[in-house]
Amino acid sequence: SDVYKRQLQDLVKIMAYYKMNTLQIHLNDNGFKQFFGHDWSKTYAAFRLESDTYPGLAAEDGYYTKREFIDLQKLAENLYVEIIPEIDAPAHTLAFTHYKPEIGSKEYGMDHLDLFNPETYKFMDGLFKEYLEGDEPVFRGKKVHIGTDEYSNKKKDVVEKFRAFTDHYIRFVEGFGKQAVVWGALSHAKGDTPVKSENVVMNAWYNGYADPATMIKDGYQLISIPDGLVYIVPKAGYYYDYLNEPYLYKEWTCLLYTSPS
């Protein structure tokens, strides 16, 4: 709705006032199926950006037109706030499998893309390309976030496919002159398939998914956002409803990649 769009514009202005300079916008996600009768087809999911490549993909209950998203980025640029758009895949992708069920994973759940299906790559290539191509792309900034958050690591073959997917989309966005940003996942997804690290930025959010010392050794640039300290998920029960401001002010620095024991 227009209210939420105005809120995002206001957020950019507030960030600039407080000298905050980076806003990552997570454009797709979904609920947990246990809250929707254990039925993936009824589980809430949304992708929030207009798409001409895939008409009808954008959520009916609210999305940004391409022009609105471009204008938001221009506002941010004028205020020296960097917007990093994120399309999260190959997990958190129920909005995409609602739209195209054949690319959903039968084994790991429909919120996971099927990494063994070539159609998955065709779909995601088409989606990223829409916002990256042309002289005035929809994704205007220097960085693009490709997701890679919380995919299953139950079997070695799927881990290798996940690593290949990650490497593919790092290089895909780089092909359009962008710097790739990823969620930390490569300790969770240890394997043999190489994943590009040079000039790649990683969200270090949970050490069990990406051990910071290992990731730095491997060549990644890290953004320190330890979930146990800086995540707010109201009423979830496993993260803060409000930040622990006294602790953060007195004790935390961005060099601390873990929560206090």
What are these regions (language model features)?
Residues 24, 144-145, 180-182, 201-204, ...:
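Structural recognition of the beta-strand scaffold that forms the well-ordered cores
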Residues 14, 194-200, 207-259:
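Flexible, acidic glycine-rich loops studded with aromatic residues
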Residues 180-189, 196:
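Acidic, contiguous N-terminal accessory segments
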Residues 5-176:
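Substrate-binding cleft of carbohydrate-active enzyme catalytic domains
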Residues 174-184, 212, 222-226:
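Acidic/polar loop patches that form or flank catalytic/metal-binding clefts of enzymes
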Residues 86-88, 149, 183-186, 205-206, ...:
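Active-site-proximal beta-strand/loop segments in catalytic clefts of secreted hydrolases
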Residues 2-7, 257-261:
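Conserved small/polar residues in nucleotide/adenosyl-binding loops
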